[in-house]
Design a protein with these regions (language model features):
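N-terminal/domain-start alpha-helical segments
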Residues: 1-95
Length: 95
């Protein structure tokens, strides 16, 4: 299973990456909006772990781009932001 982690906080990103790799998942990472955008446009993943607040743009914008590309990756939002509006929009966009 190939997983993409798009998270700007290095400690959290590395913790998730190590945990998944320990379970033998293939993991790629991106630390900002543009790096994440490049990866979702170029590659296919089984699952994307996506932060909402990213340098350069939002995770919700990346969800919109996935929808435009008609990609079917499973998306799990990981965020400290606790906005009901963001949760609803994320679900509407396929997370």
């Amino acid at each position: 299973m190939k997983i993409l982690i798009i998270e700007d906080e290095p400690a959290l990103r590395e913790l998730i990456q190590r945990s998944l790799e320990k379970e033998r998942y293939v993991v790629e990472v991106a630390s900002d909006f543009y790096a994440g955008l490049d990866k979702i446009e170029m590659y296919d993943y089984d699952c994307i772990l996506l932060d909402i607040m990213l340098p350069g743009g939002s995770g919700l914008q990346l969800l919109e781009r996935l929808k435009e590309l008609r990609k079917k990756e499973n998306v799990i939002i990981i965020s400290a932001k606790d906005s009901l509006e963001d949760k609803i929009l994320g679900l509407e966009l396929g997370a």
